[in-house]
Curated annotation (Swiss-Prot):
<dbReference type="InterPro" id="IPR009737">
    <property type="entry name" value="Aim32/Apd1-like"/>
</dbReference>
<protein>
    <recommendedName>
        <fullName>Altered inheritance of mitochondria protein 32</fullName>
    </recommendedName>
</protein>
<comment type="similarity">
    <text>Belongs to the AIM32 family.</text>
</comment>
<dbReference type="InterPro" id="IPR036249">
    <property type="entry name" value="Thioredoxin-like_sf"/>
</dbReference>
<dbReference type="Pfam" id="PF06999">
    <property type="entry name" value="Suc_Fer-like"/>
</dbReference>
């Protein structure tokens, strides 16, 4: 029988679901230690000389951004394409090629609006439509709207205004601040005012999400580990009803193995309620343990970076 050490989840009051935070002795067994050591050696053999090696002894940070919306620019092409390795610049804001140049434009229109994360995502299953390579539309999936918006480049400024409508109160620290390592988000919030709000309809697509950082040019550790974790999801048939994708940089590349889960709160009149759960140091051989415990309402302490509720 699996023994667990239960801790009080500090953020439980801020999550829609009820979770136990547990420590698994199994993760510290000799077998698991050997698996992790061998895996890290394998990854390090694949890394360019300019990348710091993957070190399983590095402490997992428990710092995550506090945010209201997550905007995902859907990469074009089928699931076998590799934009996460080829097309995603070290900093996506410097990318001049479509569709990724839309990220810097959207961010500039948002200005200093806090509480909105913007990433690229490369889908690994077929629950959500993908744009074609030469598509005239930009595909944005917005969480917690749980909607796919198809936007023309000329409408990006209005789309930014539309996105701001959901940020009534937000922390002063932006996601960019978080990525460069500034202090934790202060508790105080401030109101954001909007002008020229334009409505966009979007298509509602209600599914949980599993997102794995695979941003190779940001840090090759994530670029090498990301596809391995995706393969573990697929080979082990884990959370097969979830949207699955590789995502651009979300912090934590020092320890790598970063996975974000969005879990919808399936209750009456809770259409847009969900929990955002961030994990790091997730190795492919431990993914099954993580997913099975999560499905049973347990969060593994050794991999947990933090979480928030979203509405």
């Amino acid at each position: 029988m699996l023994r667990t050490t239960v801790r009080t989840l500090q953020q439980q009051a801020f999550l829609h679901h009820s979770f136990e935070r547990v420590s698994l002795p199994e993760l510290h067994s000799t077998i698991k230690d050997v698996q992790t050591t061998c895996y890290c050696q394998n990854i390090n053999a694949r890394l360019p000389s300019t990348t710091d090696p993957l070190d399983p002894q590095i402490r997992l940070s428990d710092r995550t951004p506090y945010y209201n919306k997550h905007v995902l620019l859907v990469s074009p092409g089928d699931k076998f394409a590799q934009p996460w390795k080829i097309a995603w610049n070290h900093n996506l804001d410097t990318n001049l090629n479509r569709p990724y140049n839309a990220i810097s434009k959207l961010r500039s229109y948002l200005g200093k609006s806090p509480g909105i994360l913007i990433n690229a995502v490369h889908l690994q299953n077929d629950f959500i439509p993908r744009p074609k390579e030469d598509d005239e539309w930009l595909f944005f999936f917005v969480i917690p709207d749980m909607k796919l918006y198809k936007i023309s480049e000329t409408d990006l400024e209005q789309f930014a205004s539309f996105l701001n409508e959901g940020v009534v109160q937000a922390p002063r620290l932006s996601f960019q601040d978080y990525l460069i390592g500034k202090a934790r988000v202060p508790q105080e919030t401030h109101k954001v005012h909007h002008k020229n709000l334009t409505k966009f309809q979007g298509d509602i697509l209600l599914r949980d999400w599993s997102l794995v950082c695979g941003h190779y040019k940001r840090d090759a550790k994530c670029g090498e580990m990301g596809p391995d974790i995706i393969a573990a999801f697929q080979d082990e048939k884990l959370l097969t009803d979830n949207n699955l994708g590789l995502i651009s940089h979300v912090g934590g590349h020092v320890f790598a193995g970063n996975v974000i889960f969005y879990k919808l709160f399936k209750a009456e009149n809770a259409l847009n309620k969900l929990d955002s759960l961030w994990f790091g140091k997730v190795y492919p051989h431990n993914l099954k343990l993580l997913c099975e415990n999560l499905e049973n309402g347990k969060i593994i302490d050794e991999m947990y970076r933090g979480g928030i509720s979203m509405n």
